[in-house]
C-alpha cells in the first residue's frame, strides 16, 4: 500500500475531526511501515492520551514495539513490565519481554 498517502489521509482526518485513538493507531502503523519510528511513537502516544479509549492495550503494545525499533530497549522494557502488570495473559507480550531481556 501507499503508506505516505494513508498517513496524509489520517493526519488530515485528525486535523479536521480531532483526536481519535483508532486513527492514531492506524497512523502509527503506517509510520512503522515507512520506518518512521519516531513519528509512529508520537502517534501511539497521542492515542494513549485519549481518556477511556478502547484501544489502550493495542496502543501501549505498539508504543513498546516502536521503542524497540528505535533501539531504546531500556524504555521498552520498563513499559513492557508495566504492560504485563495490566495485561498479564498477553502471550505475545510475554514472548516480547523474553526478547527484551536479551538486549
Indicate where each model-derived feature is located.
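Register position in tetratricopeptide repeats
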Residues: 33, 69, 102-103
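Start-of-helix register in tetratricopeptide repeats
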Residues: 22, 55-58, 92
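Short coil turns that delineate tetratricopeptide repeat
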Residues: 18, 52-54, 88
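Canonical tetratricopeptide repeat
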Residues: 26, 60-62, 96
Amino acid at each position: 500500500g501507499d503508506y505516505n498517502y494513508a498517513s496524509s489521509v489520517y493526519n488530515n482526518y485528525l486535523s479536521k475531526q480531532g483526536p481519535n485513538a483508532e486513527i492514531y493507531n492506524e497512523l502509527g502503523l503506517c509510520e512503522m511501515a515507512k520506518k518512521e519510528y519516531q513519528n509512529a511513537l508520537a502517534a501511539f502516544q497521542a492515542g494513549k492520551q485519549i481518556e477511556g479509549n478502547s484501544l489502550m492495550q493495542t496502543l501501549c503494545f505498539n508504543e513498546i514495539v516502536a521503542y524497540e525499533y528505535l533501539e531504546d530497549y531500556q524504555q521498552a522494557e520498563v513499559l513492557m513490565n508495566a504492560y504485563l502488570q495490566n495485561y498479564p495473559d498477553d502471550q505475545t507480550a510475554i514472548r516480547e519481554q523474553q526478547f527484551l531481556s536479551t538486549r
